Regions:
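Gly/His-enriched, cation/cofactor- and phosphate-binding structural elements
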Residues: 1-96
Length: 96
């Protein structure tokens, strides 16, 4: 959740443009999509409901376009447990 917007988080999916766009179109209750890899690189996608470039900038000095952006979390630690990743990202979102 980011400022009342609902998002989907994936871990190590990679190449998210097509699956993220398809997911967001098929699930209009979701406003954004984030995939983070084991090195802390995140890709963000949206379908016009939230500015993910602004989100990426505020999260970790990232950037991009309104519907497609990215950033790198320098303090991210590789983990196996998805719940740890989810907690990490939600804590970051809560701070912006």
């Amino acid at each position: 959740i980011y400022k009342g917007h609902k998002g989907l988080l994936t871990y190590c999916l990679g190449s998210i443009s097509i699956p993220a766009n398809a997911f967001l179109r098929a699930n209009p209750e979701y406003d954004f999509f984030i995939d983070i890899n084991k090195k802390g690189n995140a890709s963000l996608r949206a379908d016009g409901k939230v500015d993910v470039a602004l989100m990426a900038t505020k999260l970790a000095n990232g950037g991009g376009h309104v519907n497609a952006s990215g950033c790198k979390f320098e303090d991210f630690k590789e983990v196996i447990d998805f719940n740890e990743v989810k907690t990490y990202i939600q804590n970051k979102l809560n701070k912006i």
